């Protein structure tokens, strides 16, 4: 039986998610502060996500996708 590195997978998905949030936010042309307002979240929370320092709830994932006007799955796609 193979053992997965759960912690490694967790770090990878946090990096993919945070990087995509930053990419799509910049493409949208909004600052972290304005984006946080659009999401109904605090600016430091957005910064922590983009800098890979925070895990995130499903509710907040949906808020972010809605504010970016994209499908949620795109935030988890590696390039």
PLM region spans:
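A short, Lys/Arg-rich alpha-helix, primarily the initiator
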Residues: 3-27
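Residue-level preference for short helical/loop micro-motifs built around acidic side chains
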Residues: 15, 34-37, 74
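Residues within the helices of the helix-turn-helix
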Residues: 22, 33, 62
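Alpha-helical residues within the helix-turn-helix
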Residues: 26, 37, 66
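Short alpha-helical DNA-recognition segment
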Residues: 29-48
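Short, basic-rich loop-to-helix N-cap that marks the start of a DNA-contacting helix
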Residues: 53-63
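Hydrophobic micro-packing sites on short alpha-helices
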Residues: 61-65, 75-76
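Short C-terminal boundary/hinge segments that cap the last helix of small helical domains
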Residues: 69-79
């Amino acid at each position: 039986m193979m053992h997965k590195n759960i912690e490694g997978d967790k770090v990878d998905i946090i990096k993919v998610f945070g990087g995509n949030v930053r990419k799509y936010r910049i493409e949208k042309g909004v600052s972290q502060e304005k984006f946080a307002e659009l999401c109904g979240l605090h600016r430091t929370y957005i910064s922590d996500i983009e800098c890979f320092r925070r895990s995130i709830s499903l509710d907040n994932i949906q808020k972010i996708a809605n504010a970016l006007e994209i499908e949620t799955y795109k935030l988890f796609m590696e390039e």
